């Protein structure tokens, strides 16, 4: 039987919905990803963020390799019902595969002619040590 709450979400033509992940407390935007129905259902069941990896074509439990799990406190649906917001606690403060707190670590500075993207957040942990080959 279809779950009514899942049917309320306006899934795109690929069966996906965009997801914004925001940290509880700081309100920092940590990352952007996609979910399919299974990912959203698993997120609710586990209380941890599960996404759909478009590159791997499979469910991706955030932190499955790095240990940087996202504990979900709240799930919201926007006014058009086509974007999901997760409010999370980010384990070990690292959300980005680059070893940074947020995936949004580049800030535009300057004007239209001479502007450029500047890195404004430090690497908290070397990614090679996060994703080192496991025995």
UniProtKB/Swiss-Prot annotation:
Gene3D superfamilies the UniProt entry points to: Phosphoribosyl-AMP cyclohydrolase (3.10.20.810)
Q: Which positions bind Zn(2+)?
A: 79, 96, 103
For this UniProt entry, the molecular function terms from Gene Ontology, in alphabetical order, are:
magnesium ion binding; phosphoribosyl-AMP cyclohydrolase activity; zinc ion binding
Q: Which cofactor does it need?
A: Mg(2+); Zn(2+)
List the GO biological process terms.
Answer: L-histidine biosynthetic process
| The protein's annotated pathway | Amino-acid biosynthesis; L-histidine biosynthesis; L-histidine from 5-phospho-alpha-D-ribose 1-diphosphate: step 3/9
Which parts of the chain span the membrane according to its record? none
Describe how the cofactor binds: Binds 1 Mg(2+) ion per subunit.
Q: Name one Pfam family in it.
A: PRA-CH
Q: InterPro entries of this UniProt entry?
A: PRA-CH, PRib_AMP_CycHydrolase_dom, PRib_AMP_CycHydrolase_sf
Q: What HAMAP family would the database entry show?
A: HisI
Cited function = Catalyzes the hydrolysis of the adenine ring of phosphoribosyl-AMP.
Subunit: Homodimer.
Family recorded in the similarity comment = Belongs to the PRA-CH family.
Name this protein carries in UniProt? Phosphoribosyl-AMP cyclohydrolase
Gene source species: Cupriavidus metallidurans (strain ATCC 43123 / DSM 2839 / NBRC 102507 / CH34)
């Amino acid at each position: 039987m279809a779950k009514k709450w899942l049917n309320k979400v306006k899934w795109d033509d690929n069966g996906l919905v965009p997801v914004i992940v925001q940290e509880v407390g700081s309100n920092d935007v940590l990352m952007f990803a996609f979910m399919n129905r299974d990912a959203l259902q698993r997120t609710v069941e586990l209380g941890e963020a599960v996404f759909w990896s478009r590159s791997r074509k499979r469910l991706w439990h955030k932190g499955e390799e790095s240990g940087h799990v996202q504990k979900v406190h709240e799930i919201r649906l926007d006014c058009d019902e086509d974007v999901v917001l997760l409010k999370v606690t980010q384990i070990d403060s690292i959300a980005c595969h680059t070893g940074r707190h947020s995936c949004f670590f580049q800030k535009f500075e300057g004007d239209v002619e001479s502007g450029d993207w500047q890195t404004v957040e430090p690497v908290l942990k070397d990614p090679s040590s996060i994703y080192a080959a496991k025995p």
